[in-house]
Amino acid sequence: MPDTDVAIVGAGPYGLAAAAHLRGAGVDVRVLGEPMSFWRTMPVGMLLRSNWTATSIADYRGPVSLDAFCAATGVQVDRPVPLARFVEYGTWVQQRIAPDVERRPVERLEAGPKGFRLMLAGGERLDARRVVVAAGIKSFPNRPAYADGLAPDLATHTGDHHDLSRFSGSRVLVVGGGQSALESAALLRESGAEAEVVVRADHLNWLHGGKYQRRLGRLSPLLYAPTDVGPMGLSRLVAVPDLFRRFPRAAADPLAYRSIRPAGAAWLGPRLQGVPITMAQSIVSATALGGGVRVTFGDGDERTADHLLLGTGYRVDIARYPFLAPSLLARLRRVNGYPVLGRGLESSVPGLYFLGAPAAFSFGPIMRFVSGGWYAGRALTRAVAGRPEPGRRDAAAPAVVTISDAS
């Protein structure tokens, strides 16, 4: 017999969502990983871009929602939700649904005689009938080739920093036009750094949150899903992953891009006053220069700075997960680094599932956000528990999550 029916690799929002739904269905589960580890490394002072409802883990209603956290703890959470509060909330969820989480990292995942074998730090071996990979995006920072030759003291990714105040008094060139780059520039300015933003596009996209939804009043739910991904109308479409995965790529790819194109929350605008933003420029080279860095743009213009901060996002490539054994990786059908997934988010290796951003190619852009865990947890549980697949269902419709020890 295996040691467990399901081993979940990762204890962030997706791993916790999977555990909540699986345990609610009576499935034997072991959760492996440091709870909310990636979120704990994000920049101090960061605010979440997602709205209140879409920030809930596992479900936007029920015993582990953000509303339930506030009611149970008496904690008042500001809007936008501060990173520190979200980590506190995620830890509360973990304590309720996975108090037995095993914090040792998984060093190797391979096929085993009873399904899969996981080697944990310290040498322990764990056999599982099924494995759910919910390991997040920490392994996938997108670092442009022009920065390859620069030392870490000259060029880093936004994901490398927990506290941007280390750049106080420095000149920092921030690359990118999305939330990560723009919020980093705001935090740098507020920390006493001299920041400039360089954007390849000729304009910035801004997300106005609930502004348009409030104007629509009762019509809002018809055009905006609680998942909070995508613009008006399209939000409802991408909130149905079972529908999205049936689209031909010629339709799916443009829909996905339109839903998650680089954009910043509108509330960042006032915080960027005084920060130069250079539009329609692409960096073609970056070289070390006298303790700093010099970048050259496509039109020949140049900038010098003390540091180059890459707000260039993440590019999924599951081959970069350090724990995946090459023999297992070779059996996985992949497209551009993404695993090709079927019903229940199952990969081409039976019994191996991928949740979160790696599922975005097959199930759409909401898999890149916390709210995607609502669908992922339910779909995974239906597959694992052997329940019949229901008809297409809105990803925002809640499922009942029964937690045995909710005290």
Where are these regions (language model features)?
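Flavin (FAD/FMN) cofactor-binding and adjacent substrate-gating region
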Residues: 40-73, 225-245
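Flavin (primarily FAD) cofactor-binding/catalytic cores of flavoenzymes
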Residues: 1-36, 79-179, 183-407
